[in-house]
């Protein structure tokens, strides 16, 4: 059965001030000190557990919005494969596979400004089936949402609703001009009033300042967001971000530490860009973050599940399942040590 004790709202005050957040990002505070303080809070609320989330892109393209970072935006000419929303059965089968792969939560993502009434009802039906038949937590990302639609999704059993702020209010007009920061904030307000856990995070590396990163971290805190995905900008074909920032692995870890210390009891998730920006520090980042995505992102490939699980275990952490249990130690071992991956192990195999 699903755990019922998971919090909907963040309840713990920030550990640091805005000024201290800037010192972390500017490198004034040693990285080891940042990691030590971040790990203390991470361990306090999440112990040594890591939640693996798997995305299902249930509708790709056909989007009227003009978010500069997105390969699905209007007029992007990015070459992504466009397709309408998957059927309930297709999404359900994807959820079954995600559960087999050890996902803590199944994340459904659809392109577009926001769902209409009929789409909301279809999504609600799918969510209810997944939660009832698979006992699996579900997160939905479907754009702008009002309170009425949020309540329909809540009644269907939706666990989390994702709607990222992406950047600070001051910087928002630099990345999108078809909707406003206020509209995104209003969606979070609707989700909150419906009693759904808020999942809202950022995309770092879109030309923002360190002050912008600190400001949005505290804005998320003010909303009491319980789940914060931290994306590192990937320059996909067709993007319109004018001055992408240079992100080093160390800076990415510092950003995750800062988010942990501002939002101590929130789930801090390493999201898109992990493989390319954190690189050899991916495992180190888990001392600040307690969650990550596996098996790819919306239109970009990512580490597969066996590689992700191995990294988590190698760093001394354990993957957590929706029911609170731990992924078995022998998960994927047989296929991981296959002849394809390690041919030298089979060199002297007798027939």
Swiss-Prot record:
From the UniProt record, list the reaction(s) this protein catalyses.
Answer: (4R,5S)-dethiobiotin + (sulfur carrier)-SH + 2 reduced [2Fe-2S]-[ferredoxin] + 2 S-adenosyl-L-methionine = (sulfur carrier)-H + biotin + 2 5'-deoxyadenosine + 2 L-methionine + 2 oxidized [2Fe-2S]-[ferredoxin]
Residues the entry annotates as binding [4Fe-4S] cluster: 63, 67, 70
Q: What pathway does the annotation place this protein in?
A: Cofactor biosynthesis; biotin biosynthesis; biotin from 7,8-diaminononanoate: step 2/2
Q: Which PANTHER family match?
A: BIOTIN SYNTHASE, BIOTIN SYNTHASE, MITOCHONDRIAL
- EC number(s) for this protein? 2.8.1.6
MF (Gene Ontology)? 2 iron, 2 sulfur cluster binding; 4 iron, 4 sulfur cluster binding; biotin synthase activity; iron ion binding
Q: Please give the superkingdom of this protein's source.
A: Bacteria
Give the record's cofactor note, including how many are bound: Binds 1 [4Fe-4S] cluster. The cluster is coordinated with 3 cysteines and an exchangeable S-adenosyl-L-methionine.
Radical SAM core domain segment(s)? 48-265
Sum up the protein's function in the record's words: Catalyzes the conversion of dethiobiotin (DTB) to biotin by the insertion of a sulfur atom into dethiobiotin via a radical-based mechanism.
Q: What class of enzyme is it?
A: transferase
Q: Which cofactor does it need?
A: [4Fe-4S] cluster; [2Fe-2S] cluster
Q: How does it assemble?
A: Homodimer.
Annotated positions binding [2Fe-2S] cluster: 107, 139, 199, 269
Q: What is this protein called?
A: Biotin synthase
SMART domains linked: BATS (SM00876), Elp3 (SM00729)
Q: Which family does it belong to?
A: Belongs to the radical SAM superfamily. Biotin synthase family.
Please give the biological process terms from Gene Ontology that the record holds.
biotin biosynthetic process
> Which keywords belong to this entry?
2Fe-2S, 4Fe-4S, Biotin biosynthesis, Iron, Iron-sulfur, Metal-binding, S-adenosyl-L-methionine, Transferase
User: Which positions make up the signal peptide?
Assistant: none
Pfam families (UniProt xref):
BATS (PF06968), Radical_SAM (PF04055)
**NCBIfam families linked:** bioB
